[in-house]
């Protein structure tokens, strides 16, 4: 009898373990059954995610989360996170997805999976509309403003022609002022900085000339959740084709969605 009881206990434990593993292995089904999609989003990083004057979250990432929830036909639950805790929240099941202006790198790929890119995030050379610049070679004999010691300074220095003049400023504000005042007609900076210029000074909004360093944003998915990852990727592809991401980019980044954004 004791042996039978012991075997029954082992079988029951194995059954429970198998059931738990199966449930965890299909998070998409779990989301659909619960009718709720929990998404980790930023709360202090405009224009991707911040709290507005109405005390509600707004931004590119917020709109992306709402789009996915709507397409999955479930309610959306936004979970504010920081850069430090967004991946742990995903790993511990506190959220189903991370949509928090997150870039992809080798270390992160060891612990979570990433969707296709859904938003542009990059450093580049930007300038006025009358500057016909499309590559580093076109910077020959031109002057480019940049913040001293920044990543964009380092990237620009690697590729600028020897006869290009790199005019370095001590901080971002000085770099932006040099462009707005007409001191320089080209600057190397990030697309979010350009978004800020376009928001405050629409008539002087610089145009993207070419990229220096590309690090687009991806949706984070728990490792091994293939069904959920596949569905998120399908919806991102649909959003590209239907112009949804173009709308998000124009609304929040004041720029077109890049046609060649990395997968």
Predicted ranges, named:
Residues 62-71, 137-138, 142-143, 149-151, ...:
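Extended ligand-binding regions for polar small-molecule ligands
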Residues 37-38, 73-75, 92-100, 143, ...:
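Alpha-to-beta junction loops
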Residues 85, 102-110, 155-158, 180, ...:
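A ligand-binding cleft/hinge motif common to bilobed small-molecule-binding domains
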Residues 28, 127-144:
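Flexible hinge/capping segments at coil-to-helix
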Residues 119-127, 195-237, 255-263:
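Periplasmic-binding protein-like
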Residues 26-101:
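Extracytoplasmic small-molecule ligand-binding "clamshell" domains
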Residues 62, 77-88, 167-177, 181, ...:
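Short helix-initiation/N-cap motifs at beta->coil->alpha
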Residues 151-168, 205-208, 237-263:
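Ligand-binding clefts/hinges and TM-proximal coupling segments of bilobed small-molecule sensing domains
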